[in-house]
Amino acid sequence: MAEETQHNKLAAAKKKLKEYWQKNRPRVPAGVNRNRKTNGSIPETATSGGCQPPGDSATGFHREGPTSSATLKDLESPCQERAVVLDSTSVKISRLKNTIKSLKQQKKQVEHQLEEEKKANNERQKAERELEVQIQTLIIQKEELNTDLYHMERSLRYFEEESKDLAVRLQHSLQCKGELESALSAVIATEKKKANQLSSCSKAHTEWELEQSLQDQALLKAQLTQLKESFQQLQLERDECAEHIEGERARWHQRMSKMSQEICTLKKEKQQDMRRVEELERSLSKLKNQMAEPLPPEPPAVPSEVELQHLRKELERVAGELQSQVKNNQHISLLNRRQEERIREQEERLRKQEERLQEQHEKLRQLAKPQSVFEELNNENKSTLQLEQQVKELQEKLGEEHLEAASQQNQQLTAQLSLMALPGEGHGGEHLDSEGEEAPQPMPSVPEDLESREAMSSFMDHLKEKADLSELVKKQELRFIQYWQERCHQKIHHLLSEPGGRAKDAALGGGHHQAGAQGGDEGEAAGAAADGIAAYSNYNNGHRKFLAAAHNSADEPGPGAPAPQELGAADKHGDLREVTLTSSAQGEAREDPLLDKPTAQPIVQDHQEHPGLGSNCCVPLFCWAWLPRRRR
């Protein structure tokens, strides 16, 4: 803005000078130069243009008069001075312009620096924000780490306490080990004797069981033939009854069609009679109206007596026809009622016959059920024989590995000690202890250097290898026993719960002989069912004895020497009860030689007081509570 104002002032000054010189050049007075020469002074130049003010020039112009050539020369010198002044001012102006340009450049540089500083400040603010976010995340992570450290410290304390408890338990188990080894020496002698006895008895039991199974199969075949014959007879009777019923149905349909036709004809006749009655009533009403009309004033012709008699006869005839029609209607209504009653009776007879047919069909189905039941039982017998063969093969394999029954008992007790010793290494011991409680298995003898980890790992590998075969045997036996008991009880319960209660009476009275006296095919079927029940009960008892002998010879220490853990576990589990199958087994269980010995009693008490010290739930295989299930 300052430069523009200066330029404008310069331009205005130049214009004024030009105008001034154009006006005052020929009229310059001479006295002015003289005065200037005498005085020797130069008139002051104005800052705006360096020229004299117009008032002085005007006064000089009016004072002096006409100009001359001398005065023109005198005037040229101040003009030159003024031109020099103008040149100096232009130089100054150019310098000022250069300074202004340099200032503008400096201003641009300063603005550029300010922008760069603003960008740097923004970047610094962003970096500060990111640093604040990182600081917050680090604080949160620090808090999480502190909580994790707190939980870790708690878990470490808990693990330390558990390790102390496990160390105490290990010490106690090592103390019990010596006592158990002393008790084992007493058990070995008794187990050897029992193993020898059971090995000799197992063959006799197998042969006897095979004979029983063959006899049962023969009985079942005979019963199946009888049932097939009775079933064929019942089918023939059913066909005859069906034919008879179909013939009766055809007859009744014919009769019903005839009766319906008769009813239709009677209805038509009734309608015709009703129409006739209506016509007669109309004619009577007309005659009555004619009789009631007044006589005309003219003397009417007197009807003759013949006409009167004729009219009376017609009235009598019409009255007789009406009475006959009424009687016919009453007779037709009675016939209709009788026909309706007959139809109802016929419908009731048909309904009763249908009910009888349904009862016969149900009886046939019930008689056909025992045949399917016995077929299923035959298939079950075959499957049980196959399972027995598999069990024998597995027992032979185990017999090759475990030569003596005493070593088996030793292996069980030492395995419990090993399962108690394992928790000292970590939490894996608790898992192994729980597995041992679920499925106790015979284990080999424990090595003496249990404290070394290498010996423990090799020992556990050996235990796993030995446990696989025993697990297979246990699973097969459990599967066989559960399957046999459930199926047998289902079939026997089904046979006992037949309608009429005759199967139960026949089972209690003696099969065919007493059921036959009750009459008919139902007695024969009930007697056959009772014979099947008796045969299967004998077979079931023999099969239990055989499996008990085989199981005791292979895995169990004997019916007379149950483990202390088994005695405690049978009370804890409600669905597992120690139920002996024969009275001899009960006597042996009561006369337990281990419980009478003073060395075994403290061991049993120790296991009862300390259930965590390897007290595995060793329940015998034949202790399933199947009798309460059957009572339910």
Swiss-Prot record:
**Does the keyword field hold Coiled coil?**
yes
Q: Can you tell me where the transmembrane regions are?
A: none
Record region (Disordered) = 1-76, 423-445, 505-524, 552-573
Family annotation (InterPro entries) = GM130_C (IPR043937), GOLGA_cons_dom (IPR043976), Golgin_A (IPR024858)
Q: Keyword set for this entry?
A: Coiled coil
Q: Spell out the Pfam families in the cross-references.
A: GM130_C, GOLGA2L5
BP GO annotations: Golgi organization
* Source organism, top-level taxon: Eukaryota
Which sequence ranges form a coiled-coil region, renumbered to this chain?
85-150, 209-421
- Bias (Polar residues) occurs at 38-50
Which cellular component, as a GO term, is one annotated location? Golgi cis cisterna
Q: Locate the compositionally biased regions of type Gly residues.
A: 508-520
Q: Which family does it belong to?
A: Belongs to the GOLGA8 family.
Q: What is the designated name of this protein? A: Golgin subfamily A member 8N
Lineage at the top is: Eukaryota, Metazoa, Chordata, Craniata, Vertebrata
